[in-house]
Amino acid sequence: MNFSALKHVRSEKDPYTLMRLIDANIINTYKTLMLAKKTNVKKYFSVSTDKAASPINLMGASKRVMEMILGEFSNHINTSSARFGNVAFSNGSLLHGMVNRFYNKQPFVAPKDVMRYFLTSTEAAKLSILSTFSGKNGELFIPKIELKKIEKSFPEIAKNFLKYNGYEMHICTSEDEARNNIEALLKKKKWPCYLFDTDTDGEKLEEIFIGNEEKTIKNKFDSLQIIDIKNLTNL
């Protein structure tokens, strides 16, 4: 099972992390597949991401290429994969950042126009294990959910998080304002938040799990959709 990945769009911020992204998502997958083929491994699983569906950034494109490599190797070894979105409280996630800022008494800073769906680590693990042991050769598992019903905006997530911890969200017009007023606001049980229009190139405003030209195949699972990665031929 291959869980090595750089899955954040911010990984594209400079040439060095970009090279590491390509190495982790593409080259290492190819190398371990070659090793698996050489040693007659019975099954190879590699985790993907929702950003591989109709990718608009290099990170998503790298995972799309990884899926295509899996499809190519399915002629020699039994392969499968799974796409899912953000794992709640995982390193680099919004919730992980919120927890760190909360305990360090720092303002919340987040885009206001981005919608996200979170899985628990248990849900992500179950999906990966299910794909590994129940997925047929070349199958890509995807959660079958209505994203528009369960996606949350970052302001909504921040509001709920603060309410749970006994604070009220206080909107500031700049990050400097939020930093300068944090002590006074905390005494009133209010938490300074600066919300802005997303400025990260290649960041999808809403998540999708299935690309425009991708088609699902029939399967026995009520809560899953499956794509045959052997049919993936382009980015």
Regions found by a protein language model. Give the residues of each.
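Short connector loops/turns at beta-strand edges and beta->alpha or beta->beta junctions
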Residues: 6-9, 103-104
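Conserved Rossmann-fold NAD(P)-dependent oxidoreductase catalytic core, especially the SDR/UDP-sugar
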Residues: 2, 9-11, 15-67, 72
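Functionally constrained cores in energy, signaling, and assembly domains
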Residues: 3-4, 12, 24, 30-32, ...
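Strand-loop microenvironment adjacent to phosphate/nucleotide-handling motifs in alpha/beta enzyme folds
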Residues: 70-94, 99-235
